[in-house]
Amino acid sequence: MEDDDGRESFEINDMDLEYAMNPGGRRRFQNKDQATYGVFAPDSDDDDDEQGTSRGPYKKRSKISAPMSFVSGGIQQGNKIDKDDPASLNLNLGGEKKPKEDDEGSIQIDFDKRTKKAPKQNGAQVFAGMRSSANHGAADINQFGSWMRGDGNSNKIMKMMQAMGYKPGEGLGAQGQGIVEPVQAQLRKGRGAVGAYGKESTATGPKFGESAADAQKRMAQEGTSSRPTNDDQEKSGLKIKGSWKKSQTVKTKYRTIEDVMEEGMSASRPASHQQSQQYSNIKVIDMTGKQQKIYSGYDSFSMKTRSEYDTVDDEERTVFDVPELIHNLNLLVDLTEEGIRRSNQQLISLKDQTTALEYDLQQVQKSLGTEEQEAQHIKDVYELIDGFSSNRSPSMEECQELFRRLRSEFPHEYELYSLETVAIPTVLPLIQKYFVAWKPLEDKNYGCELISTWRDILDDSKNGRKMTFGHNKTKGDEIRAYDRIIWEGILPSIRRACLQWDPSTQMHEMIELVEQWIPLLSAWITENILEQLVVPKIAERVNQWDPMTDEIPIHEWLVPWLVLLGDRIQTVMPPIRQKLSKALKLWDPMDRSALETLRPWQNVWSAATFSAFIAQNIVPKLGVALDTMELNPTMNPEYPEWTACMEWLEFTHPDAIANIVTKYFFPRFYNCLCLWLDSPGVDYNEVKRWYGSWKARIPQVLVNYPTVNENLRRSMIAIGRSLQGEKVGGLQATPIAPMAPPPPMAPHFTQAAPVQKLSLKEIIEYTAGKNGFTYHPQKDRYKDGRQVFWFGALSIYLDSEMVYVMDPIEFVWRPSGLNELIQMAQGAQG
């Protein structure tokens, strides 16, 4: 019982109880009236007759009370035919519809297709091999699609569609957007998937609501046929059932040898046209046929004969069906096709081998011709060299002509067999004889033209060839012939000249010699001359140099070598700085010679090295000069110490000069100014002129420093306070000695008693303790007879009031200042 809202109730009714009590009994189903009206349905005796099961309706129960009825004798019973009944004579074998009442006298017979006997009629009466292999359905194929024809239910469906607005010949839908022609089923041969046998054919048929005759007439008017032609059927291998033609010509298409070979070629194409090699050994299970088949890979699966996919009509199988014979025939066909494909593959392989052998023959013939030509060239080279060797004493010109011919006439053999090595036994003795008496420092151009000619003939450095031909090479053979001639023929003379050379007096001669021969020498020979001959000789002369006694300054004969030696000369710089530091210990800042001595090294040493050297050796001397400078203009009107100090701004950073001016000059300057201002009868105009003259002497680069500017401002404040009558000096002013006009005399103040100076060893010991460094002698280690000490992690020794430290970077002993020593010790510990 359904509710009003359309939902079904799950309550238990009488039918459920009856089914539960008697599960094995016959179940009663509701008829249409019972399902509609339920318990209000009218009772009827035919209820049991209308109810049915899945097997069909029950037979009506015979009613005992009903009168007995008889069957007429003219009605067909079983397989008997009543001759008086015209309907039983209608041989409607084609499955056509029953004629109407007005056509009862006509008998329609369809001879277009054979009738099939019922399965029970075949039996054993059919000859063996001719019976059907399967029971066919009893449905008539001509009744298929009868709904599309204009009879029966089709008229009712069409009338209903026209009542809803459908127009014949147009698409379905409100706007007619539906398809006009229905989808037609087209039989595909074989059992493969869509697209397995090429492009799918398109079937044509009648439109919705159109009969077959109308569709045929329409397609005839459009120039097409409603069915595929015989040729199309033959090409597609299909046989359309239910064809409207009475007869159809069946043509047999035979497979040719070309078709079989084409299949073999497609299966044996290169890997670029086949599937990947990873699929070659995959197991393939074919379940498209009646029996399951297993293939070793996709290649073997593609080699199946096409006959396996050909379909056989069920109608043909009813005529002839012997599976064993069909299997044997198919097996013979497969073996034959396999033999054809194998023979074709062998033929193709033989053709490929023939082509490869022909190509190899051509290459061998070509190689043979080339080798014969090379053999002839080698024979000619041998004859040329053998003829030259017969000459006992060849000249230099004859040797040059020989090698020119070898390079021009036999270039391939010259490079392949390194024929330039022939020059070693022939040309080298001539070169040694030519340069045996040569003095390079006296005649630097001697033999340059000759060596330049041999370089053009023998040198192959452009090609990058450096070794001779062959596998059994000695150490001497690894050198090119031209380099070996230079090494053994010319370099001995240059070595003798370098051993006798004095770098301080013959600097220009050696530089000109090296510059003249560098373009003619290889890079490694030039490197050998500079590092093994020139630099050691310069280092030896630097060790002998004494800046206090030598008349020729070292920079005059050493600095010009920078262009040729470059960084190689840096090895002699530490001894030079060490000796200059010793020479500057007794230097007087008023001596201008130090400026000229150090000026050439400003661009030779690095900026940091040069600044450190000035800070250690020059700046302390300048500070002492400013500290002892006389400020009284009557006694020192020009102040040469100040001028000498300001000249070093060219070589050092202004910070260093500003520090010594602030430390040594301004305290004395301010003290002198205060004494003068506090003296009785002071002339402020003279004081202002004296102050202005000193301010003008200070360079602007120093005035910009805050410490210098602050000291000048302090002096101006003192002058201003003195003008107001205040005492600006902390000490009582002493009387000023009379000064002769016009230059005013500055007051002479009493110098403080000199403080007792500490020794250098005591200063180093005090500095080490103040900064937390260890300071003690090293066991059994001396430098030039002096004890070496540990200063933190550094090694130092004292010599003539000078501290020498082992440079941790250059590993040489060099002089060092106290501040630099502290910084180096801190860096070594950090």
From Swiss-Prot:
Q: Which gene is the coding source of this polypeptide chain?
A: stip-1
Q: In which tissues is it expressed?
A: Detected in muscle cells from body, pharynx and vulva, in neurons from head and tail, in pharyngeal gland and in tail hypodermal cells.
Give the UniProt entry's GO cellular component terms. spliceosomal complex; U2-type post-mRNA release spliceosomal complex
What is this protein identified as? Answer: Septin and tuftelin-interacting protein 1 homolog
One of this protein's Pfam families, by short name?
A: GCFC
Which keywords label this protein? Answer: mRNA processing, mRNA splicing, Nucleus, Spliceosome
Instruction: List the PROSITE patterns.
Output: G_PATCH
Matching InterPro entries: G_patch_dom, GCFC_dom, STIP/TFIP11_N, TFP11, TFP11/STIP/Ntr1
KW Nucleus (keyword) present: yes
Query: Which segments constitute the G-patch domain?
Result: 153-199
* SMART domains reported for this sequence: G_patch (SM00443)
According to the record's subunit comment, the protein's assembly and interactions are: Identified in the spliceosome C complex. Can assemble into large rod-like polymers.
Gene Ontology molecular function terms on file: nucleic acid binding
Q: Where is this region: Disordered?
A: 1-122, 196-244
Superkingdom of source: Eukaryota
The entry's function note states: May be involved in pre-mRNA splicing. Required for embryonic development and survival.
Q: What are the Acidic residues biased-composition ranges? A: 1-17
